[in-house]
């Protein structure tokens, strides 16, 4: 969650006095000690862990972004700006329209199924806009709206205010019911599959309301709950607190476990496809916990984390810190890459189905990193569960639609995988520093059987080399020697994790992996080599460089077969 910046009251997410109190709290009380998870495993650090090549920032634009960014099905962006306007742009940041609000706002806009927008501002008002940016209705509430609204399946929205009231508004803006909390609410409501509404408040309690707005139960944490709850497939909920803890409650409100952290947890958790609860803390650590509360791994970002993380379809996780660095972490908690943002990052990264990642920094600049993976499909892979900002558990039909849309987008962008960063002239290889050695990926349950590699091409020729790809851990790999020879490179030296490609005066160090005595290179790295172009035809992907070419029999349906989505029966993913 971003820090609140309300104009009529100055309430930081955790006052300094409370911070001093939090630091003084050493450990959980006896009643919670038995539920605390084991001590974290040694944290992975950006300096110590293996890295892959960092992607390039495709563009940076001064778009005045203040809120989290919502992304529509076609890649269009919607956000609230620090100019007190709602903006919609295309995927490249070109403005399509804007609408003036009565004040600034930091709530994430909700994108309705018809392309409309529901958003809120610090003028105590919720606004509904048409797909063209025209006002449909607005509703005046009892306080500033910092928490992001939640969209229910019937089109109604649940909105919480700093005035301490939670409202349900109909699709036409009429108040269906309201519930008085008695304390400011900065935690964005989360709606479960059964319609139950969960949110935290500054009174230190996590509240559960029925779909009709009646209080079902509350759970008392030991400090304020600024963090927004995340839900897993079974309806269990996860949130952080100012008492330096991460909590899990059952749908009935009973404590499942609590995990202590070094400082307060204002960030909102996500739940990954593999069943990890991932959330950052002001202690500078990113925590990954199994849903039973055991620490799977921790990652040391080196700066406080207030933003929620996001999971990409390959299982990697991205998160920004308050020093302005965007971190990518492997599914096992190792550093993958980092990107400098230039200013603090306190909102989550937004990821389109087309594989473009957007992250905003303090001051309003928006950065785009293209040709990455799309968002993962799982119970709660990002803040508000969806790029649309719905803030609720998706139905089975919605999950199926999301999965198919992201698979189609991934298939369409196979030739546009992450590129290598700019590669300088490299000297003869020396023992690889940590940041250039990619972490070996998990062994897949059912890897495709590779065909025998084609013998290396003896000399550059216009003939097209034919290569057979294989899939490991959801990543398409090619035999290194044939693909290098087919594109005019010589493999002069290598190790199990890297290789030196030479073409004339050009010397490129690339990440590889050894499987069965053979060096393989990921397709996404090949397509990022300088001068390599890509052509796609039915069933074939052809790579070209300086008159040379290599053809790949790329049958995605065979390489990436549909598999049951374990969290959601009847849902498939590739």
From Swiss-Prot:
Biased composition (Pro residues): 439-459
Skewed-composition ranges (Low complexity): 400-438
Keyword Signal: yes
Region (Disordered): 400-461
Signal sequence, start to end: 1-33
SMART domains named among the record's database cross-references: PQQ
Source domain of life: Bacteria
KO phenotype (gene knockout): Mutant is sensitive to gamma radiation and hypersensitive to desiccation. It shows delayed DNA double-strand break repair and delayed recovery of desiccated nucleoid.
Keywords: Signal
Domain remarks: Contains an N-terminal PQQ binding domain and a C-terminal disorganized low-complexity (LC) hydrophilic region.
Function, as annotated: Plays an important role in resistance to desiccation and radiation, maybe by protecting genome integrity under extreme conditions.
Name recorded for this polypeptide: Desiccation/radiation resistance protein DR_1769
